[in-house]
Amino acid sequence: MMYKLAPLHCRPWTLLGITPQLIESHYEGNYGGAMRRLNALTSEIESFDLATAAPGTLNRLKHDQAVALNSTLLHELYFASLGGDGRAVPEPLAKALERDFGSVSRWRQEVIALAEGMEGGSGWVILSWVPRDGRLINQVGSDHTQSVAGAVPVLAIDMYEHAYHLDFGTNARAYVATFMRNIDWAATLGRYEDAIKSAAPRPLYQKEFADVPAITPEEVKALIDAGTVVQIVDARPRHFTTKSSEIMSGAVWRDPERLDDWINELSKETPVVTYCVYGFHVGCQTAIALRAKGFDARYMAGGHYAWKAMGGRMEQLDQS
């Protein structure tokens, strides 16, 4: 299984006091880097030879995979948390915060105290819903090593020594074998059936472009790797091309404001992929304009920075 990048949800140029450069670096380097590590580790685990590997090797890989997975999940939540004005809490959520923290103000104070208490360290402050207790909590995550965000456990083996020492001494292997023979699969099935009813995170998309066909960076790469001919148009506004000397390998830059000047360079017999900086308006609008002219055009979700975050090949942009 290969994990896929989520397009950047917030619009970096609209944030107050946070520069687009910070968001770009964070998304491309940190989130993209975590996604690349996650996929590399997942690939290594899937091809892992259990018969010949040294003891503990798989444990290390699974630990590192969990860290990378948590990093991607939390970064996606972080970017999805940005983009509002930060002032008015919607009434239903305000009532929930008042119920669980005493007041919205108290909740804010606690979040700030937790965040400031991590100064110079590393980790996360997370507002979480605990289904078992039916309440919200503030959670501190040390690095990325807490349990997977949003996961609902259905089976667990306690490997602390207190779980087996009285019967098995230090023979953990015998304990595990005995545990496996004592699993209540009917109860486990019940928990599984309950877990799959949990709603997945609400998909993030631009409502104004909901009907425009999109393609993910991973899907574009798969087409290229398969040798499929695709016309890739870098439709970043001209002023963005002066800020970056890189372009997606195999793409051509064309001014989105002068579409009529270059549209005849494209073939209606070959699929077209357009992209802009972040995968918002310009790439979508260019795809819409091309589709109106009879082209099989889609926009690449996440745009230039999603391609870079995925580790897609880049080349120098010819500015001549």
Where are these regions (language model features)?
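Short acidic-hydrophobic, aromatic-tinged amphipathic segments that line or gate anion-handling sites
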Residues: 254-255
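Short, structured coil segments at secondary-structure junctions
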Residues: 247-249, 293
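Catalytic cysteine-centered active loop of the rhodanese-like fold, especially the PTP/DSP P-loop
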Residues: 260-309
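Short active-site oxyanion
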Residues: 228-232, 249-250, 271
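Short amphipathic alpha-helical segments
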Residues: 243-246, 286-288
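Feature for soluble, non-membrane regions of globular proteins
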Residues: 1-204
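Short, hinge-like loop/turn segments at secondary-structure boundaries
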Residues: 249-251, 314-318
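Flexible, polar/low-complexity N-terminal or interdomain linker segments that lie immediately upstream
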Residues: 195-243, 318-320
